[in-house]
């Protein structure tokens, strides 16, 4: 964890990252996409928690989430890169998952918002439609659902091996990531997103 200056940067910078735009909002936090100041291609999601809005219990939950994520390294669990404390905020620098969450994916029948990038198109969309087409009248492709479930089981089993119970597994807390080279080498289909379990505020 990193101690920041007593004031948050007025130019939209947190630590070594420049805030690009807001990608999410909660009752006591905003989430931004951000890029590294000297490596623009290096993206993170910055969860900026307003200290004044935290009750003692919420602060305890947040500190518990930070502690758990610092000790977790698994393909299907979102990665915490750093944590920066200022007088007004607690900033969690998280792995950036451009595919949004599973609830959006289900609601939009697989047609998720475009992955970030100048190309402006989801690189998985066309391949998914051709190789793993979703049912015409609702629902998701069976093979894709099986993959999502297998990935979730892998994450939950890992958490149980660490005596951790998430306690808030739901589609909104399952983020979608583009498969990396390591996953592809292990046989993960390139057309199917990786599931990343997020939001450990209620975990014990």
Give the predicted meaning of each segment.
Residues 88-101, 105:
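Conserved short submotifs of the Hanks-type protein kinase catalytic core
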């Amino acid at each position: 964890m990193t101690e920041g200056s007593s004031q948050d940067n007025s130019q939209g910078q947190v630590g070594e990252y420049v805030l690009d735009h807001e990608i999410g909002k909660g009752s006591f936090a905003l989430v931004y996409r951000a890029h590294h100041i000297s490596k623009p291609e290096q993206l993170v999601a910055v969860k900026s928690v307003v200290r004044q809005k935290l009750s003692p219990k919420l602060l305890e939950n947040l500190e518990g989430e930070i502690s758990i994520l610092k000790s977790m390294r698994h393909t299907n669990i979102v990665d915490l890169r750093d944590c920066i404390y200022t007088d007004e905020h607690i900033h969690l620098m998280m792995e950036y998952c451009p595919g949004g969450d599973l609830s959006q994916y289900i609601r939009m029948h697989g047609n998720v918002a475009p992955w970030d990038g100048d190309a402006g198109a989801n690189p998985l969309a066309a391949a998914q439609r051709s190789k793993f087409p979703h049912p015409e009248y609702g629902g998701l492709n069976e093979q894709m659902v099986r993959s999502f479930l297998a990935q979730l089981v892998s994450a939950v089993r890992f958490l149980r091996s660490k005596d951790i119970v998430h306690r808030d597994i739901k589609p909104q807390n399952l983020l979608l990531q583009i498969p990396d080279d390591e996953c592809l080498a292990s046989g993960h289909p390139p057309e199917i997103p990786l599931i990343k379990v997020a939001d450990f505020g209620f975990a014990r």
